[in-house]
Regions:
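Rossmann-like NAD(P)(H) cofactor-binding subdomain of soluble oxidoreductases
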Residues: 16, 35-114
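NAD(P)+-binding Rossmann beta1-loop-alpha1 motif at the extreme N-terminus of oxidoreductases
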Residues: 1-48
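Hydrophobic anchor at the start of a short beta-strand
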Residues: 4, 27-29, 81, 99, ...
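Nucleotide donor/acceptor-binding cores
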Residues: 2, 79, 119
C-alpha cells in the first residue's frame, strides 16, 4: 500500500486528502497547511512541520506554482516528491533523486466533492520506477492516465485555462445581462447545455 503525505490543503489538496483517506489501495500518512488548519473528517493527522516528513512513499506538493521549487529544496525526504502543477516543469523538484508530476486538468471547489474517476491524470517522472509508483497512485483515483512531458503539459494547461476561465467569463457576462432585466439564467440553461454538447461531440 502506497503511503502519501500531502503538502497544501487548498481546493485540490483537500480533495486529494479526502480521497486518499478513504482509499483501500493507498494510505494518507499526514498533511500540512500553513494555517495549521485541522480537516476534521480526515483520519490522518495534521503535520506540524513540513520540513520533517514522516516515512512515506510519495510527497505531493499541492501548493502555488511559485512556491514549488522553494518548498522542494527545504524538504528532507527519500520519498518521491511530485508537484501537481500544470505549468511548472518537472525540473522544479529535481533536487530530489526521485521526482515527478501528478497533474489533474480540472477545476476543484471546496464545496463540491470531486469525482476523479473520469479525470485524465497527467503524469511525468524522473525514471520508470517513479512512473510506476505514480501510476499505482493514479489508479486509486482514476481509470484514465496519460504520460506527458513538461512542454506538452504546459500546452494542455493553457488550453484548460481557455476552456475553463474564458467560458466562465462568458457565463458571467450572460448572467449580468439577464440580471439587468430581472431575467432568470434558467431560461438559457438548455442553450448552454446544447452548446457544450455540440462543442464536445461535433467540435467548436
Amino acid at each position: 500500500m502506497i503511503k502519501i503525505v500531502v503538502i497544501g490543503t487548498g481546493n485540490l489538496g483537500t480533495q486529494l486528502c479526502s480521497s486518499f483517506d478513504r482509499s483501500d489501495s493507498c494510505k494518507l500518512i499526514g498533511y500540512f497547511n500553513r494555517s495549521n488548519r485541522v480537516i476534521d473528517h480526515l483520519k490522518a493527522p495534521l503535520l506540524e512541520n513540513f520540513n520533517i516528513v514522516p516515512a512515506c512513499d510519495i510527497v505531493l506538493l499541492c501548493i502555488p506554482d511559485d512556491a514549488i521549487a522553494t518548498v522542494s529544496t527545504t524538504l528532507s525526504t527519500t520519498a518521491i516528491v511530485a508537484h501537481t502543477s500544470g505549468s511548472v516543469a518537472l525540473s522544479a523538484v529535481s533536487n530530489h533523486e526521485r521526482h515527478g508530476v501528478f497533474y489533474l486538468p480540472q477545476s476543484f471547489s471546496a464545496s463540491r466533492t470531486a469525482q476523479f474517476d473520469d479525470i485524465t491524470l497527467c503524469l511525468e517522472a524522473s525514471n520508470s520506477a517513479v512512473m510506476e509508483q505514480l501510476e499505482i497512485l493514479g489508479s486509486s483515483l482514476s481509470r484514465k492516465r496519460k504520460h506527458l512531458n513538461s512542454v506538452q503539459r504546459k500546452h494542455l494547461h493553457l488550453a484548460a485555462v481557455y476552456a475553463n476561465n474564458f467560458v466562465n467569463h462568458c457565463y458571467l457576462k450572460t448572467q449580468q445581462l439577464l440580471a439587468k432585466e430581472q431575467l432568470d439564467l434558467a431560461i438559457l440553461e438548455p442553450l448552454l447545455r446544447e452548446t457544450l454538447e455540440k462543442a464536445l461531440n461535433m467540435g467548436p
